[in-house]
């Protein structure tokens, strides 16, 4: 039997079939989005708007946290959040770490700050306090509206106010809810939020 002659047309078709069978190279993945960069906290850009009387009051509270042997008017970075909260602020731990410049865990108990370093942090936290809107509060109370009729049970609201989040005392709850319940013990929560926000 004579050897087969190469057939250029068949060879071309085979090569084309092999090329078609090979998977196309995967497209390059899109570049990862850059994390949104929050501007670094710069205490030198903070304008102090407290009155001299307020500053004296803050300084007094600050000294109560001073644990240095010679009362040097300094606190550790780790105490900063406690002092802010003692002064009526309610920052998250993430906010505290941000104004501190995101220190390492071991620096929290070793690095110290004086009152002049602390004051711009207090000013920044107090200015940026996230106060909820009317809609936020209504949405939060809607969770307890089991009937979907715009009311919540007064007893349930009392329980929530006294046991969750920043707990209120019984007296505070009673003052807040005075005259808000209807004859069935229910509270129209939209009217309740308006009442609270009006002060």
UniProtKB/Swiss-Prot annotation:
Region (Disordered): 1-44
Residues modified as N,N,N-trimethylalanine: 2
Transmembrane region(s): none
Intrachain disulfide bonds: none
Biological classification of the source: Eukaryota, Metazoa, Chordata, Craniata, Vertebrata
Composition-biased stretches (Pro residues): 24-34
Protein name per UniProt: Myosin light chain 3
Known partners and oligomeric status: Myosin is a hexamer of 2 heavy chains and 4 light chains.
Positions carrying Phosphoserine: 183
Phosphothreonine modification, residue list: 92, 131, 133
Domain EF-hand residue range list: 53-90, 132-167, 167-199
Cell membrane keyword on record: no
CDD domains in UniProt: EFh (cd00051)
GO cellular-component term (any): myosin II complex
Any GO MF annotation of the entry: calcium ion binding
Compositionally biased spans, kind Basic and acidic residues: 1-15, 35-44
């Amino acid at each position: 039997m004579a050897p087969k002659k190469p057939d250029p047309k068949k060879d071309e078709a085979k090569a084309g079939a092999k090329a078609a069978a090979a998977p196309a190279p995967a497209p390059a993945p899109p570049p990862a989005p850059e994390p949104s960069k929050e501007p670094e906290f710069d205490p030198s850009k903070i304008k102090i708007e407290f009155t001299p009387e307020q500053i004296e009051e803050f300084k007094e509270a600050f000294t109560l946290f001073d644990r240095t042997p010679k009362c040097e008017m300094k606190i550790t970075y780790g105490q900063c959040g406690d002092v802010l909260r003692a002064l009526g602020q309610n920052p998250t731990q993430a906010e505290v770490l941000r104004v501190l410049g995101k220190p390492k865990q071991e620096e929290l108990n070793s690095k110290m700050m004086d009152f002049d370093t602390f004051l711009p942090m207090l000013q920044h936290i107090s200015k940026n306090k996230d106060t909820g809107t009317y809609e936020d509060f209504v949405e939060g109370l809607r969770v307890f509206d089991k009937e979907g009729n715009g009311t919540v049970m007064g007893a349930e609201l009392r329980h929530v106010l006294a046991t969750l989040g920043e707990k209120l005392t019984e007296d505070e709850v009673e003052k807040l809810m005075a005259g808000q319940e209807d004859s069935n013990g229910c509270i129209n929560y939209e009217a309740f939020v308006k009442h609270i926000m009006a002060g």
